[in-house]
Amino acid sequence: MAAMWRAAARQLVDRAVGSRAAHTSAGSKKIVGVFYQAGEYADKNPNFVGCVEGALGIRDWLESKGHHYIVTDDKEGFNSELEKHIEDMHVLITTPFHPAYVTAEKIKKAKTPELLLTAGIGSDHIDLPAAAAAGLTVARVTGSNTVSVAEDELMRILILLRNFLPGYQQVVKGEWNVAGIAHRAYDLEGKTVGTVGAGRYGRLLLQRLKPFNCNLLYHDRLQINPELEKEIGAKFEEDLDAMLPKCDVVVINTPLTEKTRGMFNKEKIAKMKKGVIIVNNARGAIMDTQAVADACSSGHIAGYGGDVWFPQPAPKDHPWRYMPNHAMTPHISGTTIDAQLRYAAGVKDMLDRYFKGEEFPVENYIVKEGELASQYK
């Protein structure tokens, strides 16, 4: 995988925005990593590298090059470990699963930052306009967890359609009531599934749905290549509001931007078919939290599943914890062991390029030379 990323690189163009762009200078760099704490699970798997204890598996490599690597899960508040190091760090690495929120205030406070890396996909934890204005480079490991997320989406579709969770709960409680499950269990075959967004995640999901003989629809800014569209058997829907009433299942695969924040509000949900299944592994803030909870309670949404919340971590009183017929988990879909190894390798590759003054694979850039990537504008 690293070889593929290297093959995509170009030589560095000497057009950086000021001294804070990702052009490294000689000498030791201070790198701060913010990851989730593994605790008792840290030693359960030698490939568990996405946690504080695993530190992406790059500590020895970084320290052998003379760099200072600080890893923590303590990211909130003025007295946090992150706050102590933010002024003189050069690189911040964080993940969507335990994000360090990089606000305009933090960017202003930091005196030496050059590079903000996401170990995984996503950037909504970073104030991108502020990062661009400060001349920072922001990058992610594109493609590192797309398979993981698409598989998880398919799993949640099946869990909700087949009414699996009440059956599992019956077993745990020592109960046995077939009717209590069967009265709202359905096959996936023949259902109409629509994805809102058909980028890397959406396309992989559509490909995995094809063997189930579903009617596949997708809405996106851009139409998929006609040959691939024909191969998958998916139909392009230019008008989202026209697509939603057709769908038995709606899957959210669009990034969180100012345009998509709160996109699925009460009015948008009302356009969907009564009894719709919704799966959202994109970002929680794309949904109106209370509107989703209310629609689940009324039965307009027959089941809602996903691993993304707003805010994260979800507070104990978050309404999605208690709404009926949900298949929610913490933010886990993109941090399988396989995904961790991919995004750890991607981070190492970009750090290596950064130290050498080389460019990253073009698809990894979120902010470069003061400009946001097109999908974030």
Swiss-Prot record:
Binding positions (substrate): 121, 145
GO CC field: chloroplast; mitochondrion
Site entry: Important for catalytic activity: 283, 331
Transit sequence range: 1-29
InterPro entries the record matches: D-isomer_2_OHA_DH_cat_dom (IPR006139), D-isomer_DH_CS (IPR029753), D-isomer_DH_NAD-bd (IPR006140), FDH_NAD-dep (IPR033689), NAD(P)-bd_dom_sf (IPR036291)
Enzyme class: oxidoreductase
Catalytic activity reported: formate + NAD(+) = CO2 + NADH
Record's subcellular location: Mitochondrion
Gene3D superfamilies: NAD(P)-binding Rossmann-like Domain
GO biological process: formate catabolic process
Main subcellular location: mitochondrion
Enzyme Commission code(s) on record: 1.17.1.9
Residues that hold NAD(+) according to the record: 146, 220, 255-259, 281, 307, 331-334
GO molecular function: formate dehydrogenase (NAD+) activity; NAD binding; oxidoreductase activity, acting on the CH-OH group of donors, NAD or NADP as acceptor
Keywords: Mitochondrion, NAD, Oxidoreductase, Transit peptide
Keyword Mitochondrion: yes
PANTHER family, sorted: FORMATE DEHYDROGENASE 1
Oligomeric and partner information: Homodimer.
Family that this chain belongs to: Belongs to the D-isomer specific 2-hydroxyacid dehydrogenase family. FDH subfamily.
Protein function: Catalyzes the NAD(+)-dependent oxidation of formate to carbon dioxide. Involved in the cell stress response.
Name under which the protein is recorded: Formate dehydrogenase, mitochondrial
